């Protein structure tokens, strides 16, 4: 903004001697033009003030100028300003009027656009200036001088290859027509009469000038034509923020978006200025104004930079700067908030459109559900009408099942959502009671199984994770079986005799896959087991002709472990019955044999050791071994129990009661010049009385090898005495044959065990991996049905403890150690198996 109009004297002239003096007096001209501040005023020169209308005008005055200030004439003598009285306002008004009367048409000669406003170039034209000096000549005949010459230019161009009608250059790339010039209409500045482009330029360069861009660029360079007093030629740089940048910034100014900082009251002492100031929050520092340092003492003012002229500081307006900055921030905040609001509204429109689509889908779904529910209600009401006693076409159970099947097939969702329990109670239960009113389950155990299976698929709630008595309110089928079917079963069980178990077992086998699990458990625990328990208490093994296993064992597939409480009283009664038993009575074996696989291995072995083995030992002790007249009945009574008692128990009986007497008879026979052929037959005859499993036992094998050694020593010791021909060779051959049989049997057993182990392996890779001793123990435990598992959190000397049946063991370098009373004792695998059994 130019302030040159402030540096004039009382007569409106600029003081050449003191350009920095400001005159703020209000003249009569200011009062007269109070409501017309844009009126241009003609400042009178010295000659006009002296001579008035008779003043002469130099040609320099008529020359157009871009500045409102008249250039100085340094060749003229020095003029002094008169210190006389200032002319009055009335006298100046007369001069203005006379001047206006003399020049009535000066304003009319200018174009319309330059009438009431200033040109934007910053200069002021006087009304008396009508044009530029020498600018009235027309350029229409430019270049016509070529007609009065010899055309040397045209000839030279043609010699250099120029072809008329084509452009200049090697490739004729030059322009064909000369550049046209357009004459300006008036005497105004550039752009005062609109665009000055010619028709040729519009054809060659069809780019439309943007008047808005030109105006913006013009306003940008408007105030930069003046020279900086400091002599700097650097142009000021302006920074602009677009709306897109503000949107990308996406945040509000910290001063306006963080009012919570005002809450923190912190005392801040500011000593950066001339005096100490105290603030009570950090946010107040941001509101501090930058005050000029005009009041600082000379000592506190910064020293001037050497080599540069000290620039006088202009007047600063910190309040104005703060207000402008605040307006900028408010505008930015408003733009950001409007952008956020616009984005929010757009998102809201998208969300509402999605909600509208969802609600349309929900509405359509609800309409379908209402239509389906109406049809379901119609079917249910039809069934209710047919259930009335006076109905001519009563509803049957099969027809009702078809109605429910229709509901499940066509209206599945509504059927699942409806309260099937109440619907079944109201419609199905009366029909079901009428269907089973004459039913005798022991005579016709499969009566009603098909219709109940159909109703199970229709009524059972398959979403229940666990079924129990608490499901009566949630499952219609369970409630149907409990309230309609169970009363008939209770009535039948009360009349049933436990010793006649087959009809009841067949009945439950027919219904076990139909009735709920908890209903079957209730029947077995509350109805069947009490009657069996009572019957076992009344059973006497000495007087009852019907063996107990005939009416207990049929319940094993259904009751399984539920019969465990009955086994103890059964063993007790059997043990009492065996007190006076003799091994010659084979009925005991017939009674006990069905229980071998029912009792646990440990309990069965304990029962045998307590009640059977002592009787067999007593019988074997009474056996008389006589090679000439042998009675084998007692031996047969003992060997007949081989499958009932364990091999170890049988071998123990033989070691204690048989082999000592047998070896003694052999020695006595060999000492009396025997017939070795008869001894060989006697040896082979006794050995054939034992099974391969007994013969494979190490103790039995040692006893027979001991007999062979005795026979070999007897043959070898009779040197010089009479010896039966071929006796020594026969005994040697017998020994070799027996040893070879033992070796072949052991090899066959090892091969059989290897084949079994290979079959248990899953895949070739598993079978190729060598097994360790722990795997071997695990295999043996599986073969003998013994539980083998590690003890959690228990170790001995860093070794994991295991339970093998009821025995605690640990494995160390291929050796099994068994926990004794005080120490750990090593044992063999076979002994471990025998102890576990």
From Swiss-Prot:
The modification Phosphoserine is found at residues 2, 59, 98, 144, 210. Residues 1-50 are annotated as: Required for interaction with DHX15. The keyword NADP does not apply. Residues 710-734 are annotated as: Required for nuclear speckle localization. Disulfide bonds: none annotated. Residues 1-21, 50-136, 183-236 are annotated as: Disordered. The keyword Cytoplasm applies. Involved in pre-mRNA splicing, specifically in spliceosome disassembly during late-stage splicing events. Intron turnover seems to proceed through reactions in two lariat-intron associated complexes termed Intron Large (IL) and Intron Small (IS). In cooperation with DHX15 seems to mediate the transition of the U2, U5 and U6 snRNP-containing IL complex to the snRNP-free IS complex leading to efficient debranching and turnover of excised introns. May play a role in the differentiation of ameloblasts and odontoblasts or in the forming of the enamel extracellular matrix. This is Tuftelin-interacting protein 11.
């Amino acid at each position: 903004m130019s302030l040159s109009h402030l540096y004039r004297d009382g007569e409106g002239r600029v003081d050449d001697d003191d350009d920095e003096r400001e005159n703020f007096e209000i003249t009569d001209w200011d009062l007269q033009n109070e409501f017309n501040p844009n009126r241009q005023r003609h400042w009178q020169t010295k000659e006009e003030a002296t001579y008035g209308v008779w003043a002469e005008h130099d040609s320099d005055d008529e020359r157009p100028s871009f500045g409102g200030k008249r250039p100085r004439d340094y060749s003229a003598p020095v003029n002094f300003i008169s210190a006389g009285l200032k002319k009055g306002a009335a006298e100046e008004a007369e001069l203005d009027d006379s001047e206006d009367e003399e020049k009535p048409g000066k304003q009319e000669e200018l174009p319309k656009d330059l009438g009431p406003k200033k040109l934007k170039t910053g200069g002021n034209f006087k009304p008396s200036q009508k044009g530029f000096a020498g600018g009235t000549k027309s350029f229409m005949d430019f270049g016509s001088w070529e007609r009065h010459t010899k055309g040397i230019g045209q000839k030279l161009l043609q010699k250099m290859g120029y072809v008329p009608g084509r452009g200049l250059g090697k490739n004729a790339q030059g322009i064909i027509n000369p550049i046209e010039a357009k004459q300006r209409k008036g005497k105004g500045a550039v752009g005062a009469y609109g665009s000055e482009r010619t028709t040729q330029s519009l054809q060659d360069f069809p780019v439309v000038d943007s008047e808005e861009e030109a105006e913006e660029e013009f306003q940008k360079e408007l105030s930069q034509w003046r020279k900086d007093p400091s002599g700097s030629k650097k142009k000021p740089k302006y920074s602009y923020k677009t709306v897109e940048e503000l949107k990308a910034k996406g945040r509000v100014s910290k001063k306006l978006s963080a009012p919570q900082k005002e809450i923190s009251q912190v005392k801040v002492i500011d000593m950066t200025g001339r005096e100490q100031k105290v603030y009570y929050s950090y946010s107040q520092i941001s509101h501090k104004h930058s005050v000029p340092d005009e009041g600082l003492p000379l000592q506190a003012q910064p020293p001037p930079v050497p080599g540069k002229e000290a620039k006088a500081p202009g007047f600063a307006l910190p309040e104005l700067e703060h207000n402008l900055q605040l307006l900028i921030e408010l505008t930015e905040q408003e733009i950001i908030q409007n952008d956020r609001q616009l984005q929010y509204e757009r998102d809201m429109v998208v969300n509402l459109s999605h909600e509208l689509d969802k609600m349309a889908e929900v509405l359509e779904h609800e309409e379908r559900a209402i239509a389906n529910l109406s049809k379901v209600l119609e079917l249910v009401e039809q069934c209710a009408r047919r259930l009335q006693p006076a109905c001519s076409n009563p509803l049957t159970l099969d027809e009702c099942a078809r109605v429910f099947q229709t509901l499940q097939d066509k209206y599945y969702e509504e059927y699942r959502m409806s309260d099937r329990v109440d619907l079944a109670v109201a419609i199905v239960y009366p029909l079901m009671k009428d269907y089973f009113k004459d039913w005798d389950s022991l005579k016709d155990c499969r009566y009603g199984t098909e219709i109940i299976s159909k109703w199970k698929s229709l009524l059972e709630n398959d979403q229940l994770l666990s079924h129990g008595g608490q499901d009566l309110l949630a499952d219609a089928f369970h409630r149907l079986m409990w309230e309609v079917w169970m009363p008939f079963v209770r009535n039948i069980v009360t009349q049933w005799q436990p010793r006649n178990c087959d009809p009841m077992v067949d009945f439950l086998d027919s219904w076990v896959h139909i009735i709920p699990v908890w209903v079957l458990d209730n029947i077995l625990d509350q109805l069947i087991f009490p009657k069996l328990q009572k019957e076992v208490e009344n059973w006497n093994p000495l007087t009852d002709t019907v063996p107990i296993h005939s009416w207990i064992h049929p319940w094993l597939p259904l009751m399984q472990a539920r019969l465990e409480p009955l086994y103890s009283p059964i063993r007790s009664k059997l043990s009492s019955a065996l007190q006076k038993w003799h091994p010659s009575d084979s009925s005991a074996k017939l009674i006990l044999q069905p229980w071998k696989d029912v009792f646990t291995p440990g309990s069965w072995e304990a029962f045998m050791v307590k009640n059977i083995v002592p009787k067999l030992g007593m019988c074997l002790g009474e056996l008389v071994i006589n090679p000439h007249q042998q009675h084998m009945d007692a031996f047969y009574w003992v060997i007949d129990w081989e499958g009932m008692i364990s091999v170890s128990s049988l071998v123990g009986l033989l070691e204690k009661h048989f082999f000592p007497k047998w070896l003694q008879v052999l020695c006595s026979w060999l000492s009396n010049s025997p017939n070795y052929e008869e001894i060989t037959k006697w040896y082979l005859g006794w050995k054939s009385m034992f099974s391969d499993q007994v013969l494979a036992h190490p103790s039995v094998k040692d006893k027979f090898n001991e007999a062979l050694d005795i026979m070999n020593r007897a043959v070898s010791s009779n040197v010089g005495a009479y010896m039966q021909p071929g006796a020594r060779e026969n005994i040697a051959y017998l020994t070799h044959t027996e040893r070879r049989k033992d070796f072949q049997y052991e090899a066959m057993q090892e091969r059989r065990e290897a084949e079994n182990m290979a079959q248990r392996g899953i895949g070739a890779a598993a079978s190729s991996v060598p097994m360790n001793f722990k795997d071997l123990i695990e295999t043996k435990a599986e073969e003998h049905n013994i539980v083998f598992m590690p003890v959690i959190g228990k170790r001995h000397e860093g070794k994991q403890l295991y339970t093998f049946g009821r025995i605690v063991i640990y494995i160390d370098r291929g050796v099994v150690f068994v926990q004794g009373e005080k120490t750990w004792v090593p044992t063999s695998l076979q002994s471990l198996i025998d102890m576990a059994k």
